[in-house]
């Protein structure tokens, strides 16, 4: 429980602990025993980071009865009146408990504290080195190597969450997010095991500056190092970057496998060599020495697995060596121009490529009057077809031919856009219908001849023609011309049959007129469908 300053210490004045030495020897021995018990209890409480008030008071054993002050004895604490600071009585009792060592505590004028833990953590007496080499307070003798004397304005920051007043040297109890507990074995405890705690202070011993000055440091013990190694194994070895690196290595090994099949094998099917190599140089050397052989070989055949040559021999060994680069992927001829980065399997291809950088065009057109020049002979050969009218590049889908392969490629795009090719008429083949209605087609367009028709058929044809003319005239807004058109057509059809035919033609004309009057309503619906 927390102690109240009112009933226990009615008046505590400002003074020094220097006159505390007049106590009796028995009181000094009792105070020393209490001091040792408090330090042992404090060390035990530190292992739990002193998280509860009960553990605080149990560790420090603040009992004013054992530390009675004489009426004339003064303390290092200024009286603030009853109830000014709840922890002032406990702080005074703790300071009085130090006995002859209170000279290291000094005066205190900082902000008020809410608990005894706050006072003990902020007090300068804990963690400082004694002049004689003895050390007292929160940190034991094993921790003296990292703690030095501080100025009067300094304090210790044991937990990153607590604010701290520090001087030019800062606190050295926290290193890279870890704090020194002062226990045997140089144990470093981390307030949060796997998360970096952002401290509000800026001092020369921050984590970033320690990393920059000393490189990555592992300040933990063996058990912490093992935990860190296990954490690294679970969180870093399965990173996607490591996976892709592993897959890339496997792909490289897969490409550097010798697939040469020994023709002298007796087994069937024959197996390939399947030796794996780490570098291209090792693979090429193996194939050249073990399989291709030296100049004594007279048969230059490629026996690489699934080779498209299918046992067809080369005339010279160097041609076989150049061919094997197709299988191995070797390209030993890089472009020497900076920034290009292209590599080639054949030296002649590199020679041609370098002309793109130099602009050299040594191959001139051999046709008289043409001054075209080319970087390689194959381009010149393609150009020569323009002068000879030779068109060796034929289209496989039609009968057209071209002098240059680029022209053929452009032509092939036409077939790709219209696979069916050219058609005779869109209306006949593509399903398109004519814009002219079937009933409006002129009789002259019919395949049958009007001279071979009977008078009745001629009259019917005249009536149909009159109806068509009438509909067209109505469509143009000329209603009066429909009858004349019908009469003219009727007279024309009747002229082939003499007088009787003329009468029939007249009837046809009148019939055509009636057909115009009667069929107009029937054709109007068709117009609405065709011309909307």
Swiss-Prot record:
One GO CC term, this protein: nucleoplasm
Regions that span the bilayer: none
Mutagenesis / variant outcome for changing residue 152 to F: In HPE5; 50% reduction of luciferase activity; requires 2 nucleotide substitutions
Record's keyword terms, sorted: Activator, Cytoplasm, Developmental protein, Differentiation, Disease variant, DNA-binding, Holoprosencephaly, Isopeptide bond, Metal-binding, Neurogenesis, Nucleus, Phosphoprotein, Repeat, Repressor, Transcription, Transcription regulation, Ubl conjugation, Zinc, Zinc-finger
Keyword Membrane belongs to the record: no
One Gene Ontology biological process: visual perception
Main localization category: nucleus
Biased composition (Low complexity): 417-435
Region described as Disordered: 406-452, 475-532
Pfam families linked: zf-C2H2, zf-C2H2_15, zf_ZIC
Zinc finger (C2H2-type): 256-291, 300-327, 333-357, 363-387, 393-415
Entry keyword Nucleus: yes
Cross-link (Glycyl lysine isopeptide (Lys-Gly) (interchain with G-Cter in SUMO2)): 253
Domain notes: The C2H2-type 3, 4 and 5 zinc finger domains are necessary for transcription activation.
Free-text function comment from the UniProt entry: Acts as a transcriptional activator or repressor. Plays important roles in the early stage of organogenesis of the CNS. Activates the transcription of the serotonin transporter SERT in uncrossed ipsilateral retinal ganglion cells (iRGCs) to refine eye-specific projections in primary visual targets. Its transcriptional activity is repressed by MDFIC. Involved in the formation of the ipsilateral retinal projection at the optic chiasm midline. Drives the expression of EPHB1 on ipsilaterally projecting growth cones. Binds to the minimal GLI-consensus sequence 5'-TGGGTGGTC-3'.
UniProt disease link: Holoprosencephaly 5: A structural anomaly of the brain, in which the developing forebrain fails to correctly separate into right and left hemispheres. Holoprosencephaly is genetically heterogeneous and associated with several distinct facies and phenotypic variability.
Family membership noted in the UniProt record: Belongs to the GLI C2H2-type zinc-finger protein family.
Protein's recorded name: Zinc finger protein ZIC 2
Species of the source: Homo sapiens
């Amino acid at each position: 429980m927390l102690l109240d300053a009112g009933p226990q210490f009615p008046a505590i004045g400002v003074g020094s602990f220097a006159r505390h030495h007049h106590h009796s020897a028995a009181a000094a021995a009792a105070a020393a025993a209490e001091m040792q018990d408090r330090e042992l209890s404090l060390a035990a409480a530190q292992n739990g980071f002193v998280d509860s008030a009960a553990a605080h008071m149990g560790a420090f054993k603040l009992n004013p009865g054992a530390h009675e002050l004489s009426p004339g004895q003064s303390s290092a604490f200024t009286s603030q009146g009853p109830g000014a600071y709840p922890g002032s009585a406990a702080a005074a009792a703790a300071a009085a408990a130090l006995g002859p060592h209170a000279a290291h505590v000094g005066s205190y004028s900082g902000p008020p504290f809410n608990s005894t833990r706050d006072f003990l953590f902020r007090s300068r007496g804990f963690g400082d080195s004694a002049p004689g080499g003895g050390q007292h307070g929160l940190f034991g003798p094993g921790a003296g190597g990292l703690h030095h004397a501080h100025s009067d304005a300094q304090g210790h920051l044991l937990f990153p969450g607590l604010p701290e007043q520090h001087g030019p040297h800062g606190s050295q109890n926290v290193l890279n997010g870890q704090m020194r507990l002062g226990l045997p074995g140089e144990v470093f405890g981390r307030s949060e095991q796997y998360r970096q705690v952002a401290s509000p202070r800026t001092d020369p011993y921050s984590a970033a500056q320690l990393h920059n000055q000393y490189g990555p440091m592992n300040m933990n013990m063996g058990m912490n190092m093992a935990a860190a190694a296990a954490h690294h194994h679970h969180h870093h070895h399965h990173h996607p970057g490591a996976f892709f690196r592993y897959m890339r290595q496997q792909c490289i090994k897969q490409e550097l496998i010798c697939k040469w099949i020994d023709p002298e094998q007796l087994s069937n099917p024959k197996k390939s060599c399947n030796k794996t190599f780490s570098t291209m140089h090792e693979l090429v050397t193996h194939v050249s020495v073990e399989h291709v052989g030296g100049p004594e070989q007279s048969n230059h055949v490629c026996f690489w697995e699934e080779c498209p040559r299918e046992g067809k021999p080369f005339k010279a060994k160097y041609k076989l060596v150049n061919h094997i680069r197709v299988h191995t992927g070797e390209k030993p001829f890089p472009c020497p121009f900076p920034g290009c980065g292209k590599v080639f399997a054949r030296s002649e291809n590199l020679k041609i490529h370098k002309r793109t950088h130099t602009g050299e065009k040594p191959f001139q057109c051999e046709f008289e009057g043409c001054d075209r020049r080319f970087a390689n002979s194959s381009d010149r050969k393609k150009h020569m077809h323009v002068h000879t009218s030779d068109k060796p590049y034929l289209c496989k889908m039609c009968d057209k031919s071209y002098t240059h392969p680029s022209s053929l490629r452009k032509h092939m795009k036409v077939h790709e856009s219209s696979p069916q090719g050219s058609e005779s008429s869109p209306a006949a083949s593509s399903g398109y219908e004519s814009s002219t209605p079937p009933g409006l087609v002129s009789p002259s367009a019919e395949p049958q001849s009007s001279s071979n028709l009977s008078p009745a058929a001629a009259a019917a044809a005249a009536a149909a023609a009159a109806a068509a003319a009438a509909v067209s005239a109505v469509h143009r807004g000329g209603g009066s011309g429909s009858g004349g058109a019908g009469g003219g057509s009727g007279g024309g059809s009747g002229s082939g049959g003499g007088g009787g035919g003329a009468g029939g033609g007249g009837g046809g004309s009148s019939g055509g007129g009636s057909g115009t009057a009667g069929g107009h309503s029937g054709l109007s619906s068709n117009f609405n469908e065709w011309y909307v």
